Amino acid sequence: MKKGTVLNSDISSVISRLGHTDTLVVCDAGLPIPKSTTRIDMALTQGVPSFMQVLGVVTNEMQVEAVIIAEEIKQHNPQLHETLLTHLEQLQKHQGNTIEIRYTTHEQFKQQTAGSQAVIRSGECSPYANIILCAGVTF
């Protein structure tokens, strides 16, 4: 369910069409995107825009009730993992709900992206900078 404004028309459109429990992926520059899934490519060059910049814009617009993250981020990108957890804590406070955090293997994560409404690709070039956002409702 859409809750704000965003300039990118593709992102705005996909968020406005999300129903309860639909999913949307924000990923790094290297995640393979299934051909059957809508790709919204924001990457300009390495690191631009960053994963957290894209995620911040998307979560400002989207009501989130759960997220799925690859377990490997804890070991291979601990700094981003901590930044991500802090962002999710702040988002919970802003939205007034609890966001369930689910971990899975990176292989299972890649398989789950096929069921998403879209994959938004950032320019991030650090390992496991990927998240599946599960849409909530604002009421």
UniProtKB/Swiss-Prot annotation:
**Assigned keywords, A-Z:** Carbohydrate metabolism, Cytoplasm, Isomerase
E.C. designation(s)? 5.4.99.62
Query: Which InterPro entries does the record match to this protein?
Result: D-ribose_pyranase, RbsD-like_sf, RbsD_FucU
Q: Does the keyword Isomerase apply?
A: yes
Active site: residue positions: H20
Compartment(s) where it occurs, according to its Swiss-Prot or TrEMBL record: Cytoplasm
Give the UniProt family note: Belongs to the RbsD / FucU family. RbsD subfamily.
Q: What function does the entry list? A: Catalyzes the interconversion of beta-pyran and beta-furan forms of D-ribose.
Q: What is this protein's name?
A: D-ribose pyranase
What organism is recorded for this protein? Escherichia coli O1:K1 / APEC
Q: Per UniProt, what is the name of the gene that codes for the protein in this document?
A: rbsD
